[in-house]
Amino acid sequence: MSLKTFTIAPDPANPKLTERVRGLDQDGREIETAVTVERPLTLYLNGQEIVTMMTIGDYPDCLAVGYLLNQNMLRRDDRITGIDVDEETDTVVVRTERATDYEAKLKKKTLTSGCAQGTAFGDVMETFESVSLPADVRLRTSWIYALSKQINLQPSLYLEAGAIHGCVLCQQDRPLVYMEDVGRHNAVDKVAGYMHLNGVSAGDKIFYTTGRLTSEMVIKTVQMGIPILVSRSGFTAWGVQLARQANLTLVGRAKGKRFIALAGTDRLVFDADAAGADEEDRRHGRKGSRDDD
C-alpha cells in the first residue's frame, strides 16, 4: 500500500479527545486549559475478554488489532472476520476465523514500564528471537533531521494539551502515519494495527517515537519487522541490549543536530551538515505543549 505524507495525523480539534478545564495559575489568576481525555476500552477476542486499556479513544480498531498482534494473540495469517466497536459500552470485539482460547496465557503476564497499564506475555520473547530484520536498509542523517522537523511542527494533541505520547511510521524523510495516546504502548499498537489492516510493508520503514527507548518499545518495533527506531528521548540498558541482539538500528536523543546511535550503526549514512540542521532546529523548533510533560 502506498501512503502519502501524514496519511493519518493527530486531530487536536476533535472535541472527543480533549476537555476544557478551569483552574488557577501560579499567580492565582483564573485560566482555562485543554486536558487530554482518558477512557477505558475493553478488548474481546472471539468473545473472550482480553484486557481493559486506558486510551484517548480514537482508532479503537487499530489499537485492538495492534495489541493482539504484539501480544502474539493474533497471527499474521489470521483472517479477521469482523471488528465491532461499541462506544456506549467502551468495548471492541475482534473476531477471527480461527478459534482462540488464551485463558492460560492471560494468567501469565508481566507489567511493563509503559504508562496506562502496559503488559507483556512470556512467549513474546520467544518470537522476538526468531525475527530477522533486513540488513541492507540505510538511515541517512538528513532523514533524521527532516523527520524531527516535520513531526515537531505537525499540530498534535501533545501541543494542544500535553500528557500524551506519539508514534510515527515513516519512510525515508516522510512521516506517514502519526498516532498519539496516553500510553506509548497504545500509540505503537495503533500503528501496528493500521499497518496490518491496510497491508503496509515494514522492511523499508522507520519508526519514530516521542517516548523512551525501553525494552517494550524495542520488542514491539522488532515484532513489527521495522529495522530502524528513532526517538527524541533516551534509552534503557535492556532496550539497547535487545536492539543489538536483533540488529535494530536504535537512535535516541534526536534533537536538532544531535543524536546518539547505540545499536545497528552500520545502517547510518552521514550525509547532512549537522550545523545547518541545528540552525533549522532553532528557526523551526518545537516549542512544547501548552502544558508540557
Where are these regions (language model features)?
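A general structural signal for short secondary-structure boundary/capping elements
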Residues: E87-T91, R138, R212, G252-R258, ...
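Short, Lys/Arg-enriched charge-dense amphipathic segments
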Residues: R98-K109, M179-N186, Q223-S233, G276-E279
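Long, low-complexity, intrinsically disordered segments
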Residues: E280-D293
